[in-house]
Regions:
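Non-transmembrane, aqueous-exposed alpha-helical and coiled segments at domain scale
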Residues: 1-40, 44-156
Length: 156
Protein backbone atom coordinates (compact mmCIF):
# COMPACT_ATOMS: atom_id res chain seq x y z
CA UNK A 1 0.00 0.00 0.00
CA UNK A 2 1.21 3.48 -0.85
CA UNK A 3 -0.37 6.92 -0.74
CA UNK A 4 0.51 10.26 -2.26
CA UNK A 5 -1.11 13.67 -2.40
CA UNK A 6 -0.69 14.92 -5.94
CA UNK A 7 -1.13 18.47 -7.15
CA UNK A 8 -4.22 18.99 -9.33
CA UNK A 9 -1.90 20.07 -12.14
CA UNK A 10 -0.26 16.63 -12.13
CA UNK A 11 -3.41 15.24 -13.72
CA UNK A 12 -3.51 11.82 -15.37
CA UNK A 13 0.25 11.88 -15.99
CA UNK A 14 0.84 12.26 -12.25
CA UNK A 15 -1.36 9.24 -11.56
CA UNK A 16 0.56 7.19 -14.15
CA UNK A 17 3.93 8.28 -12.73
CA UNK A 18 2.80 7.39 -9.18
CA UNK A 19 1.52 4.01 -10.42
CA UNK A 20 4.79 3.10 -12.16
CA UNK A 21 7.02 4.37 -9.32
CA UNK A 22 5.02 2.45 -6.73
CA UNK A 23 4.78 -0.72 -8.80
CA UNK A 24 8.53 -0.71 -9.46
CA UNK A 25 9.25 -0.19 -5.75
CA UNK A 26 6.82 -2.94 -4.76
CA UNK A 27 8.34 -5.34 -7.28
CA UNK A 28 11.99 -4.68 -6.45
CA UNK A 29 11.52 -4.81 -2.69
CA UNK A 30 9.23 -7.86 -2.71
CA UNK A 31 6.28 -5.92 -1.31
CA UNK A 32 3.82 -7.38 -3.81
CA UNK A 33 3.58 -10.93 -5.06
CA UNK A 34 3.19 -10.79 -8.79
CA UNK A 35 1.00 -11.03 -10.71
CA UNK A 36 -0.95 -8.66 -8.49
CA UNK A 37 -4.43 -7.25 -8.66
CA UNK A 38 -3.89 -3.51 -8.28
CA UNK A 39 -6.49 -1.25 -6.70
CA UNK A 40 -6.26 2.51 -7.01
CA UNK A 41 -8.27 4.98 -4.94
CA UNK A 42 -8.55 8.52 -6.24
CA UNK A 43 -10.10 11.52 -4.52
CA UNK A 44 -11.89 12.09 -1.25
CA UNK A 45 -9.74 12.59 1.82
CA UNK A 46 -6.91 10.25 2.83
CA UNK A 47 -9.22 7.81 4.63
CA UNK A 48 -11.70 7.65 1.76
CA UNK A 49 -8.93 7.34 -0.81
CA UNK A 50 -7.30 4.44 1.03
CA UNK A 51 -10.64 2.67 1.53
CA UNK A 52 -11.55 3.02 -2.15
CA UNK A 53 -8.19 1.63 -3.26
CA UNK A 54 -8.47 -1.37 -0.95
CA UNK A 55 -12.03 -2.06 -2.06
CA UNK A 56 -11.03 -1.75 -5.72
CA UNK A 57 -8.25 -4.29 -5.21
CA UNK A 58 -10.12 -6.74 -2.99
CA UNK A 59 -13.79 -6.58 -3.91
CA UNK A 60 -13.95 -6.12 -7.67
CA UNK A 61 -13.94 -9.19 -9.89
CA UNK A 62 -10.95 -9.67 -12.22
CA UNK A 63 -11.89 -8.37 -15.66
CA UNK A 64 -14.48 -5.95 -14.26
CA UNK A 65 -14.25 -2.37 -15.50
CA UNK A 66 -15.44 0.89 -14.00
CA UNK A 67 -18.74 2.05 -15.57
CA UNK A 68 -17.17 5.43 -16.43
CA UNK A 69 -15.55 4.88 -19.87
CA UNK A 70 -12.64 7.25 -19.14
CA UNK A 71 -11.80 5.47 -15.88
CA UNK A 72 -12.20 2.07 -17.60
CA UNK A 73 -9.79 3.18 -20.32
CA UNK A 74 -7.29 4.35 -17.69
CA UNK A 75 -7.59 0.98 -15.89
CA UNK A 76 -6.70 -0.83 -19.13
CA UNK A 77 -3.83 1.56 -19.86
CA UNK A 78 -2.35 1.19 -16.37
CA UNK A 79 -2.57 -2.60 -16.59
CA UNK A 80 -0.71 -2.53 -19.90
CA UNK A 81 1.90 -0.10 -18.52
CA UNK A 82 2.45 -2.33 -15.50
CA UNK A 83 2.93 -5.40 -17.66
CA UNK A 84 5.37 -3.61 -19.98
CA UNK A 85 7.84 -2.86 -17.14
CA UNK A 86 9.73 -6.10 -17.78
CA UNK A 87 9.01 -7.57 -14.35
CA UNK A 88 7.01 -10.75 -13.97
CA UNK A 89 6.14 -13.47 -11.51
CA UNK A 90 8.28 -13.43 -8.33
CA UNK A 91 10.19 -10.37 -9.60
CA UNK A 92 11.77 -12.29 -12.49
CA UNK A 93 11.74 -10.71 -15.93
CA UNK A 94 8.51 -11.07 -17.86
CA UNK A 95 5.25 -9.36 -18.78
CA UNK A 96 2.96 -10.47 -15.96
CA UNK A 97 3.38 -7.90 -13.20
CA UNK A 98 -0.32 -6.93 -13.11
CA UNK A 99 -3.18 -9.43 -13.38
CA UNK A 100 -5.73 -6.61 -13.36
CA UNK A 101 -6.07 -2.98 -12.38
CA UNK A 102 -9.19 -1.45 -10.80
CA UNK A 103 -9.82 2.18 -9.92
CA UNK A 104 -12.48 3.80 -7.75
CA UNK A 105 -13.01 7.56 -7.65
CA UNK A 106 -14.53 9.95 -5.10
CA UNK A 107 -15.26 13.66 -5.12
CA UNK A 108 -12.44 15.77 -3.67
CA UNK A 109 -11.36 19.33 -2.99
CA UNK A 110 -9.70 21.04 -5.95
CA UNK A 111 -6.60 21.89 -3.87
CA UNK A 112 -5.20 18.37 -3.89
CA UNK A 113 -5.59 15.00 -5.55
CA UNK A 114 -5.11 12.10 -3.12
CA UNK A 115 -4.23 8.79 -4.74
CA UNK A 116 -3.57 5.41 -3.12
CA UNK A 117 -2.41 2.13 -4.58
CA UNK A 118 -2.85 -1.36 -3.17
CA UNK A 119 -1.55 -4.66 -4.53
CA UNK A 120 -3.71 -7.68 -3.81
CA UNK A 121 -2.04 -11.07 -4.17
CA UNK A 122 -3.34 -13.19 -7.05
CA UNK A 123 -3.34 -16.28 -4.83
CA UNK A 124 -6.00 -14.80 -2.56
CA UNK A 125 -9.34 -16.56 -2.57
CA UNK A 126 -12.78 -15.30 -1.75
CA UNK A 127 -16.36 -16.42 -1.94
CA UNK A 128 -19.66 -14.73 -1.34
CA UNK A 129 -22.98 -16.28 -0.42
CA UNK A 130 -26.40 -15.07 0.65
CA UNK A 131 -27.90 -16.95 3.59
CA UNK A 132 -31.70 -17.08 3.59
CA UNK A 133 -33.97 -17.42 6.64
CA UNK A 134 -35.07 -20.90 5.54
CA UNK A 135 -31.45 -22.11 5.75
CA UNK A 136 -30.77 -22.06 2.01
CA UNK A 137 -27.37 -20.72 0.92
CA UNK A 138 -27.06 -19.07 -2.49
CA UNK A 139 -23.55 -18.65 -3.91
CA UNK A 140 -22.91 -15.31 -5.58
CA UNK A 141 -20.12 -15.34 -8.22
CA UNK A 142 -20.25 -11.53 -8.58
CA UNK A 143 -21.69 -9.94 -5.44
CA UNK A 144 -21.95 -6.47 -7.05
CA UNK A 145 -20.67 -4.49 -4.09
CA UNK A 146 -20.18 -1.43 -6.29
CA UNK A 147 -23.75 -0.39 -6.98
CA UNK A 148 -24.62 2.89 -8.75
CA UNK A 149 -25.75 4.23 -5.36
CA UNK A 150 -22.44 3.28 -3.74
CA UNK A 151 -20.54 5.04 -6.52
CA UNK A 152 -22.87 8.06 -6.17
CA UNK A 153 -23.60 7.95 -9.92
CA UNK A 154 -26.95 9.60 -9.29
CA UNK A 155 -25.25 12.68 -7.80
CA UNK A 156 -24.92 15.46 -10.33
Amino acid sequence: TDYRMLFPGDGIDGIKRFFLDTLMTFGKRGLACQPAIVGIGLGGNKDTCMRLGKEAACLRVVGDRNPDPEIASLEDELKEMGNSMGMGVMGISGRSMVADCHMEVAFTHTGGMPVSMHCFCLSSRRASARLHADGKAEMRPNPNWFTPYYRRESVS
